[in-house]
């Protein structure tokens, strides 16, 4: 079986990443980054999302650190858009969704207008992407990123991080006067990634410790639920197994177990453990066992379960597939998890023979993406039906490039520090120590 670091595979990863980055340029609009249609054009009539803008900003910060021309100005555009168009002029924080920028706003840099109910709420998920973008951009030559990161940390600590429970709050009314009576593991998953990025940008270990507290709760939930991490909780953090039972196709809060997020938890556990160890702190003794159990359970629940290749979007609490749509982001989370697990297992002494099942899954999943998802121009199909035909039932149009670029980079980077810091420190294509890297392939 080929290795993660085979010369031709790494060359393919790098070449296609540059193609994807070129494709992602289509998302550039006034006020941030927008939706790309399936034909590659940007839809500038839709409201502009903080999520998408921050994610694209993060990716172009990464590309800037890689030295890819044109990326710095796109990163700077994202930071300026977040700082101006999305910044709430009357209350703390940033709008989650704004109306398309009008001509007079382009000339004056006036704040954006929040779009609908969602736009008037302050979201932990969006804050996590903002933190990740600002943290990565602060390592580039975008000078205003450091100030944005400072402001974002203040808002995160004031409203979203809950020190008492060791997790993040979900959403608030615009003025932060009322918090949603719901807690989700999705927001906490994204918070882990954001906190690790902030820790690397600020050199403040408390963010790693906060990420570890979130991961500890996810591990506890996995142990108590047959190695599945449930998604939905009420305002007092009681598990709500019936949340959205009538809307299994909800794109953000589907009923049941979210397969992509469970693969994500498997990876975040080993990333946090690596960050703790790198900073002289002790990870939980069973972190690797729990990460493997979650990964193995999720793969068994979701991969090739209905006579066709592909990974189901959701399963019920017993592992039966529910939403059988295939979302590309789910498979990218699976691929990143298999890489992170293999690296972590090698650091613990696993042999190449013991890692062979992970190598096999890795290349089978890349073959699936190449066969059904990846186009030569950098477009990745975002959604397929159960027969692996392109679909737009849940997510019309093309996905942004956050997940595609991330999965193309993961095999080339260590589990810690986070991607931007690892690249800035010269760790690209050095994911393991020299000793473990050599031993991995012997």
What residues fall within each predicted segment?
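Glycan-recognition and catalytic cores of secretory/periplasmic carbohydrate-active enzymes
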Residues: 1-442
